[in-house]
Amino acid sequence: MPIAAALLLALQVTPGASAERPMLDAFRTVCDKVQSLDDMKAAAQESGWTEFAEGAEPRVERLNKLGRDAIGEDGTSSGANFRKALNGRTLFLLVTRFEDKSGFWGTGCRIYDFEATAGIPDADAESWMGRKPTGVVSPGASVGRKLLWEPGWREGFTVEVSHVPQSSPLREKFGLSGNILVAQAIGGF
């Protein structure tokens, strides 16, 4: 009986620890390298993410198409899509790079937990980032909420933690729902 009790204790979440912390940490492992597409791809592969082909996941393909359509003939884009099972849910990681004809570039690193029904509590996100956000965007309960840190963990990029309710009009319009983590960097100007 003492062994069983010890195992149960070992499996419990530490009091005060966020149930979303593994997702937040998985995001930081890859997206801390947001200034380099190659570094993000390598970090994703090294940390157990599985790359998948364009078109293999309709929700991801829809987001990728929206991005390509926005770029049009104005520049080029490249990237990779990954997935990973974590805490019983499938997460999707998209790493991208865009460059326009003038040399302006942007890199992005995003994790989508499309099925999340509740946002990451502000206190958990603040604890994970180590400080309060520099901005909060909250256009309404039906649309969602975004916490923003500028800079992110250090100078040179931003970090966002968002939640889009399953009933949001953004789900119908863009395919967005659940928890979305974003890191972005820009340059070339």
Label each residue range with its predicted role.
Residues 134-189:
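Glycine-rich, aromatic-bearing surface loops/beta-hairpins
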Residues 49, 82, 93, 109, ...:
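Hydrophobic beta-strand residues in large extracellular and virion-surface proteins
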Residues 15-42, 99-123:
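Terminal, regulation- and interaction-focused segments at domain boundaries
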Residues 76-149:
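Long, charged/polar, surface-exposed segments that mediate recognition or autoinhibition
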Residues 45-73, 126-144:
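Short secondary-structure junctions
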Residues 26-55, 179-185:
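Short N-terminal secondary-structure initiator segments
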Residues 2-12:
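Sec-dependent N-terminal signal peptides
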Residues 14-24, 41, 55-95:
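Accessory recognition modules or surfaces
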